[in-house]
Amino acid sequence: MPGNHHPDDVSSVLRELVAAGRFQEALARHRAIGDPVLRQRAEVQLLAATAATRLGELSLAVSLAEGALDRFRSRGDRDGRMRAVNLLGAIAFEHGKLDIAERCFGEALLLAHDLDDNLMEARASNNLASLAVLRGRPEAALSLYRSALLAYSKLGDRRGTTEAYHNLGITFRLMKEWQDSQDAAAQAIRHAELVGERSLLALAVMGRAEIELERGDRDLARQELERASALAQEAGDAVGSAEVQRLTAVLAIAQGDYPTGLRLAQEARAVAERFGGVLLRAECHAAAARALRGLGRTVEAEQHRAEAARLFESLGAVRWLEELRREWS
């Protein structure tokens, strides 16, 4: 992208690419900006940070989002500051830094309320709900997710609606409310299909696969995992592909195919370590521990179990830690 483009033109191009789910192209466009002043404009940096976050390049995303936040603060731009801290909260969540994430989401929610920004209020509520799920407070999460869903629906934001339904599906699944979880997952897929973004659709399909896996419908779970894998690969979504691998590992282990389960869990963990996803890393260690125990490799199994427990504990992931302890008691 030549350096003599007008800043607003550059922002518009990046915004369109991000909105279309073309995150790799957006990041490539940002890297190609010749003018360093233009490349470091707050809005341009924040859009590039959003693309990097969606691609799982979290270290780059932090650097870009923090740069944008500094510039927004220096010029007293509360709207920009709100969007930047919300994104930094999402990145901190993926890195397992939940106290930082909660602080960022709380700040974003307060700013959104002051600015009467209903969309950001919905996003911040959605993000705070995800923290509540992780910390074992599903009832609190349901209330926040429903508030976010209502706001997204009123605003006509299909991406947000997809994410809220997907998260409701997860929460109902954790509560063993199968019909509600299936209904929410179906709605997530319907809205994701209307958005037309492959990585978002992969996420929604994966949500349904995990529900069916826990319900015991392994054939349907496999079909949905195959679909999610193809979508994530088409989107160039490495982290999404790793999530599919982890679930496919869980399926293989449930069917007694421990070698395949171990291989897939280890491959997914390598991706999680590269991109800094702590929860995914912990879940991969837990899956590897189950596979190794099935193979009779008890010493290695215990090592992976202990590492999974350590990571779950560091996250405050109450439900995940309790489930692991039940399995190994």
Label each PLM-derived region with a short phrase.
Residues 1-13, 263, 267-270, 274-329:
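C-terminal non-catalytic interaction modules
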Residues 18-19, 46-54, 79-94, 119-134, ...:
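Conserved alpha-helical positions within TPR/SEL1-like repeat arrays
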Residues 34-37, 73-77, 94, 111-117, ...:
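Short coil/turn linkers that connect adjacent helices within long alpha-helical scaffolds
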Residues 177-277:
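Eukaryotic tandem repeat interaction scaffolds
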Residues 1-85, 109, 314-329:
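Flexible inter-repeat linkers and adjacent short helices
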